[in-house]
Amino acid sequence: INIGSKLMLSSIASMLIMGTIRFFVQQQWSIQTFGKLSFTLSISNMFLTFINAVGIVMFPLLRRTNRDRLSSLFQTLRGVFVPLTYAILIFYIPAKIVLGMWLPEYEVSLRFMGILFPIVIYEGRMSLLINTYLKTLRKEKTILMVNVLTLTLSLLLSLFVIFIIGNLNLTVGLILASLAFRCNLAEFFLCRDM
């Protein structure tokens, strides 16, 4: 129960990182603006669903791996995964062209996509590599701490950026910055513990 509750709270905090920003955008700007941002996030989530499915398969494999080999295996997987996810960004331009012709009224969404598409890199690395490894090493408390810290930081910064500065592009950039911070912080703790 102790491990499960930490993972559940961690998962809720992780969802709220983007969820609170989406909520504040909905409160501050029009429903059309919110819809365009949500469209972009939905496309990013489509890629993340595939990556999460691979992460679910990896966990049992890592649990059976000798603990002494986990560090070298992490370096190998990271060496494959990071360039692969950066390569996915190449598809941004063709996707923008095709979607621009198909949905011309969503031009703003396509601009957001350029900022938010890198979410796939950070969220993918987080769910496929870092969280899977932290769970394998029984570091659920670290996952929870990183997600709660990122949620707190994201919440405070989003209140400032959305309601005081009032800049939508900065708000969209804040989503990416929050997820990049979470990924890098979790990876720091993972590398320190391995």
What would you call each of these model-derived segments?
Residues 1-18, 57, 61-71, 190-194:
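Interhelical loop/hinge segments that connect adjacent transmembrane helices in multipass membrane
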Residues 1-10, 68-85, 108-114, 136-144:
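Membrane-water interface at loop-to-transmembrane-helix junctions
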Residues 2-3, 7, 24-45, 107-111, ...:
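Interfacial/gating helices of multi-pass transporter permease domains
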Residues 15, 42-45, 120, 150-152, ...:
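Residue-level recognition of pore/gate-forming positions within transmembrane alpha-helices
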Residues 44-68, 130-136:
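Helix-loop junctions and terminal segments of transmembrane helices
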Residues 51, 74-124, 152-164:
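Alpha-helical transmembrane segments of multi-pass membrane transport and lipid-handling proteins
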Residues 110, 138-141, 151-184, 188, ...:
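Membrane-interface helix-loop junctions in multi-pass transport and translocation proteins
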Residues 120-148, 188-194:
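Membrane-interface junctions at transmembrane-helix termini in multi-pass inner-membrane proteins
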